[in-house]
Amino acid sequence: LARWQYHFENGSTEAVLNALSYYQNDDGGFGHALEADSWNPKSSPIQTWTATEILREINFTDNTHTIIKGILHYLESEKSFDGKCWYKLVKSNNEYPHALWWHTEIDSTDNMDYNPTACLAGFMIRFAEKNSELYNRGCFIAKEAVNQLLADERENGMHTITCYLRLMQYIEEAKAADIIDLAAVKARLSGLIHCCITQETTEWETSYVCKPSQFFDCPGSVFYADNQKAADFECDFIARTQLDDGSWNITWDWDDYPSQWAISKNWWKANGIILNLLYLQGFGKL
């Protein structure tokens, strides 16, 4: 609700931060179903990444604020970190209602998947004190992540590609272009994003697919030109597929915990409403 009010009803940044703070644990990490497909109250890298996305959505960059300081403290503590990557999957998820894809028998990076590590490294570079130990660790992780990306060592899905995109954006915002080869990263991401977007638009309404809004929400994006047809189509698609209750269809399902999934599904619907309207707004359609 605070996010909606911020974007569309002149709501305050403070209201969003206050709501977000209830999901933050004493260790600085986030839990409590902020990412609504896992009800694990304990801190995890994925839930903490979700918090960074909300901060980015409201353009909040004050690194003296307790929320950002807490996140940096959590990352510095190296909880759920194997020395190279933060765990994408944490075993404590199993103790609470969750989607099948968050179930795991061991804490795992999912075979060195840089989701959410690339984004978290970028967050460190953007908000830690420059040349601090934490900043330098973020730089090291970023270089390792980019090496994997450019070496094409693994197939990266849309969520991992988005984490690399965030890494690039954070580095640009930190004016730290010397850390990685930004031009090479941008070129690689351009190709990956185009290939990742589901061009068969008949699948969009009923399948869990990748749409342009996964990566950008306005024509000013450097990735718009190569994906203009699909991006413009998405505006029409959003307008055409709104349900009678004002929301949009959720194209995935937990296949377990039906009572909790019914609640999480509504949380996802609320999130989808905000993101869809922001996309239309970015394209001048509101």
Task: Please provide the spans of the model-predicted regions.
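Preference for long, amphipathic alpha-helical scaffolds in soluble/luminal domains
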Residues: 1-286
